[in-house]
Structures are given as structure tokens and as C-alpha cells.
Amino acid sequence: MLVERDPVPRRVEPRVEPSAARLAWDGYCAGPFVLRTDLGYFMYGTDPRGNCSDGRIFPVLHSTDTLTWTSLGGALEPPSERAPESSFWAPEVAAMGGAYWMYYSTGIGDGGHHLRVASAQHPAGPFRDSGVDLTPDLPFTIDPSPFRDDDGSWRMFFATDDLQTTRTAIAGRR
């Protein structure tokens, strides 16, 4: 189906009543992803400090109304082969086959990131890494976004970049 769009994008002005604007949670949770379950809503995010106070990675929050959030600590058990300087980015979680699957990227600083997957029996975790690099042949991959297609199969979008070492340009993979 072809959907025609206005060729000139219009700016959308946010409309927030001053009395409604409030901080839902005062901690750090960059790039949040929210999973709706029968148990409520679970929010996962990136924390630049690495581990949460319980030693796990990726803060996980819970809410029953999306207005009030409670920290549950970290979601991901640190992978055993993790380098001390590893960074972890952009988790997203999908429920399938009676389990919860967390897709995320990991690398050193902002380089060499690859996608990985971890599983748990509860949306709060603890998630345990599968030990599998999902993108071994790609030099830099981030932002995994799994989804169930119309035909019932699972697919994933993600970002990838090839950094050219002889130039200052970024080239995309084909």
C-alpha cells in the first residue's frame, strides 16, 4: 500500500500542560525501551557508568501506570568474557517462546560494537548472555530492534557503520 505524505515536513510542537510535566524517574536511563507485559511495564536503558549498584548491566524499572517507576536494579548479568573496559548500549527486549530475550550491543568505548542476545524467565531478569556474537562479520553494529513480522517470524533492525581508515568519511554496508 502506498501512503502519500506531505513533501514538506512540518514541525510538531509539543503540548505539555505545566501541571502535567513531571519527572517520572530521577535516575539515568538513556535510550529507554519500554516493554508492556501482563506484569506491567518494564523500562530498560543505557547507563554510562556501566554496572548498576547490584553489579548488573542496564537499569531496569517497573511501572503499572507509566507514571510512577521503581528501580529494580540491573537487568543483565555481566558476560563472563567481558573486558573490564567494555561498554554496553541500547537494550531492547522481546517476549517469545515463554522467555524474554534482550538484544544489545557491546564493545570497547565507542568502537567495535557487536550485537548479542541474553535470555531470562522474567522481564526484570536476570538476563544471561548466550555467548553468541550475532554480527561477527560486521565491524560496528548498534541499536538492535527485534520485532514480530506480519507472517509471525521474528526479525531485527539494527544500525551498522564501516569506518574507513584511509579517509574521514563513513560508508554504509550494502
Each model region followed by its residue ranges:
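Carbohydrate-active catalytic/glycan-binding domains of CAZyme proteins
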Residues: 1-174
